[in-house]
Structures are given as structure tokens and as C-alpha cells.
């Protein structure tokens, strides 16, 4: 994927994520962006960090749950926690039985039976939204997170310097990291590693542990 293929903020929203998208980025071993073993390593870090921070995880909301890798590893790492998977793709909802919905307007209480969760996971979703929709999504993530949020969103710097463009979808809205940090900072403490603890959780961090 060349740099010129990365979408600018004015681009049209992608309306669907069908079988071809998931075949390329998740099923094909040569072109997939991640797999369950990678998510297991990541989730093991998140679980260990939250245990250290004394943030209990009894409920998990995975927004944009995709092919269900977080569900698989959540059963191993948090066996007592209840997992809720929400997915925008109609294709995946039919395949896996997820609750269909969007991070921009999901009514969690009405659709899932609860308004907030100990851990919210939102991985690789927000870069598919324009600025206004992404800002609305961040407000919702703050509303749903009682304990912690794990957030991953591709930024301009990531596209230039960090990601493997050969397997990363460049048809996205690239923004600066400050766009996310400024909005997250109102509601979360940045604990590092993509982990953000809700200010409602009352987590005490030493100065160099996070912001």
C-alpha cells in the first residue's frame, strides 16, 4: 500500500465491510494485519496491567469485534467476565451472531442490557470514521467505560513510520495523535500501551506511569 493511498479527512465513509475485506485483512495468512496469537499477546499485557492497577474486569464491551479474536482470548484471561461483541459489518453479524451497531450511536443499555462496562475494547475502528463521527465515538467510549478502555487507532505518524503498509488498510481517515489525546484526556488517564483508565475508576498512577 503506497502512502498516496491513505485517505484524507474529506473522503467518503466506507459503507460496508464485506467478505472480501475480511478475507484480505484477517483470513489470508500472507495479507492479514493480525491474528489471534497477536491479540493474545496484546490482551495478556492489558490483563496484567489492569490487574496491577487493581481494575477488576467483570464485563467487556468489544466495539468493532470483527472476527472475534478478543472474545477468544477474553475467555482465557477473564473467564468470569461477560463479553459483549458489537460489530458494524452486516456480513460478520450474520456469520458470528454479533449485535449489529456502530460506535457512533450505539444505545448500549437498550441493545445490550447495560450502559457501562469494566473494560471497553475499540481496536482499529476509529480511523474508518470522519472527524465528526470519531469525536462522537470517543464521547461514547468515555460514557461506556467504568474501568478501562483499550484503544488502537491508526494515526498519520503511524502510517508514515510505524505500520507495515503492505498489510495495513490505507483507505482510512488519518489524524494526528493529539486529536485523540485531547478528547480522551477529559475522561481518561493515559496509562500507556493503549490503555486508558476512566477517571471514574479512581486509579492512582505515579507520574512516570502515565498522564
Positions of PLM-derived features:
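Short catalytic micro-motifs in class I SAM-dependent methyltransferases
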Residues: 124-128
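Class I (Rossmann-like) S-adenosyl-L-methionine-dependent methyltransferase catalytic domain
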Residues: 1-113, 129-211
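A conserved beta-strand element that flanks and buttresses the S-adenosyl-L-methionine
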Residues: 121
Amino acid at each position: 500500500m503506497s502512502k498516496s493511498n491513505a485517505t484524507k479527512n474529506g473522503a467518503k465513509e466506507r459503507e460496508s465491510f464485506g467478505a472480501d475485506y475480511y478475507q484480505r485483512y484477517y483470513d489470508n495468512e500472507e495479507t492479514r494485519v493480525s491474528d489471534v496469537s497477536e491479540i493474545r499477546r496484546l490482551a495478556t499485557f492489558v490483563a496484567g496491567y489492569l490487574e496491577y492497577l487493581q481494575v477488576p474486569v467483570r464485563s467487556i464491551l468489544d466495539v468493532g469485534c470483527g472476527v472475534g479474536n478478543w472474545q477468544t482470548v477474553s475467555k482465557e484471561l477473564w473467564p468470569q467476565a461477560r463479553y459483549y461483541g458489537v460489530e458494524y459489518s452486516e456480513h460478520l453479524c450474520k456469520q458470528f451472531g454479533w449485535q449489529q451497531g456502530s460506535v457512533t450511536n450505539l444505545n448500549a443499555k437498550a441493545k445490550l442490557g447495560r450502559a457501562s462496562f469494566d473494560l471497553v475494547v475499540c481496536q482499529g475502528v476509529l480511523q474508518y470514521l470522519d472527524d465528526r463521527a470519531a469525536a462522537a465515538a470517543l464521547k461514547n467510549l468515555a460514557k461506556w467505560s467504568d474501568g478501562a478502555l483499550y484503544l488502537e487507532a491508526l494515526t498519520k505518524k503511524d502510517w508514515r513510520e510505524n505500520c507495515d503498509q503492505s498489510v495495513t488498510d490505507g483507505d482510512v481517515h488519518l489524524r494526528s495523535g493529539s486529536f485523540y489525546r485531547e478528547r480522551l484526556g477529559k475522561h481518561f488517564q493515559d496509562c500507556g500501551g493503549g490503555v486508558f483508565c476512566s477517571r471514574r475508576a479512581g486509579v492512582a498512577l505515579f507520574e512516570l506511569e502515565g498522564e
